[in-house]
Amino acid sequence: MTTIGTPLSPRATKVMLLGSGELGREVLIALQRLGVETIAVDRYDNAPGQQVAHHARTIAMTDPDQLRALIEAERPDLVVPEIEAIATPALEALEAEGVTTVIPTARAARLTMDREGIRRLAAETLGLPTSPYRFCDSLEELTAAIEGGIGYPCVVKPVMSSSGKGQSKIDGPEGVAAAWEYAMSGSRVSNTRIIVEGFVDFDYEITLLTVRARGADGEIETRFCEPIGHRQVSGDYVESWQPHPMPGTALERARQIAGAVTRDLGGQGIFGVELFVKGDQVWFSEVSPRPHDTGMVTMVTQWQNEFELHARAILGLPVDTTLKSPGASAVIYGGVDAEGVVFDGVDLALRVPHTDIRLFGKPESFVNRRMGVALAFADDVDTARRNAAEAAGRVTPRAV
């Protein structure tokens, strides 16, 4: 039986989020609705999640001493990483010492903090199908890897980055140097290591939200949400929709792959498993042990959205992955480089049938920064996609 205390009391159930962007913000809201005391941590002040949490803390999360000191001072029941750029060795040590519990596990946080750990686990340990790949530490190694078998076209990514930063496709030798420089500029930390992947000729890519939660008998069960289709530009999510139609054989294979990798990572919570699909063939791409940006569509498509599923699962509560309606999401971009922007056209956006919006409250806007998302539900995915895109296009951030 799960017992939850009263926030801001000696018996409070305390959860600390490491990373407090738009996804963390929604997790914090879901936790608070269940009576949890929340601590939002980020590298800068006034991050979206810090605006709604009981407590806000700002530290360099890649500094193991700062991270340990904060966790030892706050003594949260659970520590929930929401980003990759964290001093994971400190989390592993604190978990081993019994200071706190890391979600889903400290090992999972370490393996998924960069593309190398999770790719080696999936391809080399679990034997899951992936694109051909090499890891490189220099432009010379990258060139040799491509010429030595990866070939063109190929995709280059920093081993540690988020939201598509530093990711590019190379169609020929003339693009190699520029791709290397772009990858270096997009890395989340001072790391010169990249992954180069052979291009998979897929029909589409999906996110399969996979939930590990306790069932009625107390044992951990794996459940799957309906597949989420998404469109990316330069590796960054632009729109997503649910459900994405798939042949039964491909869907079963996708669930087998997602189940295998999340079972090995262990723990409880939601995982965003990214997969390439061509006909009945499925390839593993990446996994995040947390809610996924493409999964924001679940705020209008599921009875329990991905943030509520994560909150429930980590607290040991029952989950329900049932789809209630087809729907879509579309990104609202900053459009300007400015602090403290205002948003025009919110009323116009909400006049589009069956739509809603989320503005993330980011303190600073950039031209291509994700500042919000439009959501729409409809009788079919195509209508929902059109309506979400229309609503997003009516919102205009403006510098003041």
Curated annotation (Swiss-Prot):
GO terms (BP aspect): 'de novo' IMP biosynthetic process
Binding residues annotated for N(1)-(5-phospho-beta-D-ribosyl)glycinamide, in chain numbering: 22-23, 82, 293, 362, 369-370
Binding-site residues, ATP: 115, 157, 162-167, 197-200, 205
GO molecular function: ATP binding; magnesium ion binding; phosphoribosylglycinamide formyltransferase 2 activity; phosphoribosylglycinamide formyltransferase activity
Pathway per the UniProt entry: Purine metabolism; IMP biosynthesis via de novo pathway; N(2)-formyl-N(1)-(5-phospho-D-ribosyl)glycinamide from N(1)-(5-phospho-D-ribosyl)glycinamide (formate route): step 1/1
Protein family membership: Belongs to the PurK/PurT family.
Chemical reaction(s) catalysed: N(1)-(5-phospho-beta-D-ribosyl)glycinamide + formate + ATP = N(2)-formyl-N(1)-(5-phospho-beta-D-ribosyl)glycinamide + ADP + phosphate + H(+)
The keyword Membrane appears for this protein: no
EC number, as in UniProt: 6.3.1.21
Function: Involved in the de novo purine biosynthesis. Catalyzes the transfer of formate to 5-phospho-ribosyl-glycinamide (GAR), producing 5-phospho-ribosyl-N-formylglycinamide (FGAR). Formate is provided by PurU via hydrolysis of 10-formyl-tetrahydrofolate.
Domain of life the protein comes from: Bacteria
Chain sites annotated for binding Mg(2+): 274, 286
Gene3D superfamilies associated with the record: 3.40.50.20, ATP-grasp fold, A domain, ATP-grasp fold, B domain
Name of the molecule in the record: Formate-dependent phosphoribosylglycinamide formyltransferase
Alphabetically ordered keywords of this record: ATP-binding, Ligase, Magnesium, Metal-binding, Nucleotide-binding, Purine biosynthesis
GO cellular component: cytosol
Domain annotation ATP-grasp: ranges: 120-315
Subunit annotation: Homodimer.
A Pfam family this chain is assigned to: RS_preATP-grasp-like
